[in-house]
């Protein structure tokens, strides 16, 4: 219950910040263009707080924090006194109106740059992209990539950490091939490798794109030695103790801890014969994994043990931290990468290269907000930057109810020398609203199906 409330609070704070930034962009440019702003509202519904400034603008914080708006003087909406017509939105030039409309998304992009600038000033801990292992017959194996190598770049984009690698990989979904630069760890002798992506299939919301290529990142070393056996668990009932080393499972030599995890997961309620070592003494025990439900008509095995973990050596860790000026460039570059990724993913949703079930809605965003806030300020800022970029790009989509739709009408007006008829605009708004509701419905359906 507390985690739900925490996620909800982090989501509301994030939404409030991003909506305020977006609407302030519209507000600020409207004021600079001489448009009278009547109301600046964060949220919808009943006003919880309101204040009016000297220029007659009413500032409102409303009950429902799921949006916001800037109400400008406009003769198309209501009658305007003759002495105020020059302050009406509809009486401004096409370029001025386009500037006002596009200012919201631009504000979101600028906010992302500021957020990442703070991240890089504070410093973000990360792990260098060193390969721990390569899965046999995988895409990476076929490209002759081997363990111990460090991924230096993906299609020319530098990858100083695993997050950068994943960001670059996701944008390549649907491509036929990809170039990666690799070098032995600690070396700058970079070799370019070509990966054949025609058989590369994975679901971004469920799978790691790195692992889907057959690359297993170098991480903390997990030994097949038990650090803890939970009381009352299947492992304790089988006689396992902390300090036991698992050597074989059903007669097969255990090469890595993950193999044991998969054996337990895939055999709920089924006996597994374990050969173990306890203080150098060989023993044989039978483990019957407990059964836990993980969805409709699906269950997994659960043993109730924790393995011994040897932390990752310091030479594999890094902190991305820069001075004030370098951080500006890095923040801009990171924001540009996110913008390209968002546009690419939206395009691939349309072409079918990415399945529609990868679309996320407010529940997934709330979960992400709560999780990032738990990790700390740096990760919450990174989350805000990501959502801010997404909000900016989506608002530029040419749907009439979005900023992009308004820009489309203004472009048509500029080309034809007159505004689009109100009848056409009204019809377009209806169609756009229906499409937006359908998309939101699909996103919510995907959210609930992931719970």
Curated annotation (Swiss-Prot):
Membrane topology, from the record: Multi-pass membrane protein
Active-site residue list: 23
PROSITE patterns: PDZ, ZINC_PROTEASE
Names of the cofactor(s): Zn(2+)
Regions annotated as coiled coil: none
Keywords: Cell inner membrane, Cell membrane, Hydrolase, Membrane, Metal-binding, Metalloprotease, Protease, Repeat, Transmembrane, Transmembrane helix, Zinc
Entry keyword Zinc: yes
Residue ranges of domain PDZ in the record: 115-186, 199-280
GO CC term (a single one): plasma membrane
Residues reported in the UniProt entry to bind Zn(2+): 22, 26
Keyword Cell inner membrane: yes
Entry GO MF terms: metal ion binding; metalloendopeptidase activity
Pfam families per UniProt: PDZ_6, Peptidase_M50
Membrane spanning residue stretches: 98-120, 377-399, 427-446
Broad class of enzyme this protein falls into: hydrolase
EC number in record: 3.4.24.-
Localization terms from the record: Cell inner membrane
Gene Ontology annotations of biological process type: proteolysis
Written domain comment of the UniProt record: The 2 circularly premutated PDZ domains act to negatively regulate protease action on intact RseA.
NCBIfam families xref list: PRK10779.1, RIP metalloprotease RseP
Function: A site-2 regulated intramembrane protease (S2P) that cleaves the peptide bond between 'Ala-108' and 'Cys-109' in the transmembrane region of RseA. Part of a regulated intramembrane proteolysis (RIP) cascade. Acts on DegS-cleaved RseA to release the cytoplasmic domain of RseA. This provides the cell with sigma-E (RpoE) activity through the proteolysis of RseA.
UniProt subunit comment: Interacts with RseA.
PANTHER family: MEMBRANE METALLOPROTEASE ARASP2, CHLOROPLASTIC-RELATED, REGULATOR OF SIGMA-E PROTEASE RSEP
Note: Regulated intramembrane proteolysis (RIP) occurs when an extracytoplasmic signal triggers a concerted proteolytic cascade to transmit information and elicit cellular responses. A membrane-spanning regulatory substrate protein is first cut extracytoplasmically (site-1 protease, S1P), then within the membrane itself (site-2 protease, S2P, this enzyme), while cytoplasmic proteases finish degrading the regulatory protein, liberating the effector protein.
Protein name: Protease RseP
Origin organism lineage: Bacteria, Pseudomonadati, Pseudomonadota, Gammaproteobacteria, Enterobacterales
